Amino acid sequence: MALRVKFVFTCLTSCVFLAFIHLTPGLAQSKWSTPAQVEGPYYPRTKPKEVDSNLLDFLGRGWPDGEPLQLKGRVFDQKGVLIEGARVEIWQNDNNGIYNHHKAPNREKFDRRFQGFGSFITKKDGRYNFITLVPVPDHKRPPHIHVKIFRGQKEILTTQLYIKDHPENNRDGLLSLMLYPGQHKLLIELKDAVIKPGLRGKLGIYDFVLSKNF
């Protein structure tokens, strides 16, 4: 009887602890850091003439082809503390699967209305916010968005984000090598959303957890 009471008490204690972790902002994220992935060949060493967080409004050239995506979230350290002043960079292909990079195949066909690269400095609440395009498959790889995070001039994280449940994911070499706990956190769920008045598209929310404390 005593053993049964002890077992029930232990189970209840565990459930309460798990609920506490789930409901406490930032605490759950500190369990795993965001997995790193390779930079890839198309990081823009020469940046576009205009660099901001809205990749669809570039030099007044008009709207690029493709489905709009709002990608937003927060940046935490390992303790679950929100990080202010981190520079989040993203780069990706256009709606034709082409990068704006001198080594990219078919670069001459890149949609010049698309910025292709963006940057955002996190606020006091650790938040970042981009308006970009839903990525498309390219070079036999599933849709993905490349990400770098800096603190000052120091690069803290390089990784890639993928679309959850996309059929191309199972064919990708990098995703098939996800052997370590937490690698699934590179998958983001996209939902229909009103990004801003008059602009409908997809919404993806992703919180980065850096492997260091600051």
Listing of model-derived features with the role each one plays in the protein:
Residues 10-22:
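Bacterial N-terminal signal peptides
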Residues 27-187, 197-214:
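Beta-strand-dominated extracellular/periplasmic modules and repeats
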